[in-house]
UniProtKB/Swiss-Prot annotation:
Biological source species: Yersinia pestis
Lineage: Bacteria, Pseudomonadati, Pseudomonadota, Gammaproteobacteria, Enterobacterales
UniProt name for this protein: Sulfur carrier protein TusA
Organism superkingdom: Bacteria
Catalytic machinery residues: C19 (cysteine persulfide intermediate)
Keywords from the named record: Cytoplasm, tRNA processing
Family listed: Belongs to the sulfur carrier protein TusA family.
Pfam families: TusA
One GO-annotated biological process of the protein: tRNA wobble position uridine thiolation
Quaternary structure and interacting proteins, as annotated: Interacts with IscS.
Pathway(s) served: tRNA modification
Gene name as annotated: tusA
Amino acid sequence: MTDIFANPDKTLDALGLRCPEPVMMVRKTVRHMEEGQTLLIIADDPATTRDIPGFCRFMDHQLLAQDTEQTPYRYLVRKGITAG
């Protein structure tokens, strides 16, 4: 079985950070990525379960996977083609 979270292009450790810091860090990190690259976000703030999917929708990034059954939460995001 393949772990979709295993080989991201970049990883962002947002453990211990609280809203709005995780999403601010995601935005800053994604800004410096190439289109189509993937970012693994590791977080433990419950607000990320709402904020990261919302950020992806708003900024036209693709949320490829999320694991929010227990902490730390994991999210895999692909930078959108037209997103900045």
